[in-house]
């Protein structure tokens, strides 16, 4: 019998581990910026079994990759929730919910609809598959308030709950069609985390759920809220919207700021040189006078 090398033993251990434990955590954070021309920035960070798998602008999340992996799950293939039964409807649902909870679209919609004065809002999606246990948790953080949805294969039904007063009526929106959130958390996301973990084991060196873009490359433009003021939950399943339209590439702004900076730097250098010349002339005049020269 051929002996196992240390490398093959490690691979075997990893593959066996895939069958028992996988954990996916992604956090999105929107921070409003007061500076002119920059409305806000959305940052997404993902971890696979505790190991960083991407950190950049929310618009850089590999949504197509996540959707394709989610389509491999049994939860997607067997999905029959509400009036979502056909492949096209289920694919539209995946596209929307992954944009909602992995690219910060839900945060943008809630800020525009219910939390216009929020300076910062964040959300976390965590789902796992461990043996026969599978489930997930979605958490929204607004100030000191935390809004949570928990769902698993052992739970029959679940609702969004808040540990605060929910003065803005956010729960009313979140609990619309909550069965779709719950199904994704319990039946699709855990298996998605397993598919992601398998890919990470095979391609550990180059694996990432988020494109390696510079964080400040994409900002939310000042007008991004206007598109979401009439929003209601999962409207995008029926209407195919471009989720990236809220973003603005600020390379031109950066270049103009750099040009302005160079202009002021050059102007400052010229002024300093002029002052030094004047000082040199005055000093030379005094030296000549002290030496008795006319």
Curated annotation (Swiss-Prot):
Cellular component per GO, a single term: host cell membrane
Its membrane topology: Single-pass membrane protein
Annotated signal sequence range: 1-21
Principal location class: host cell
Location(s), subcellular: Host membrane
UniProt keywords, alphabetically: Host membrane, Membrane, Signal, Transmembrane, Transmembrane helix
Positions of transmembrane segments: 262-282
Pfam families to which the protein is assigned, alphabetical: Herpes_UL37_2
Superkingdom: Viruses
UniProt xrefs under InterPro entries: Herpes_UL37_HHV-5-rel
Protein family: Belongs to the herpesviridae immediate early glycoprotein family.
Protein name as it appears in the record: Putative immediate early glycoprotein
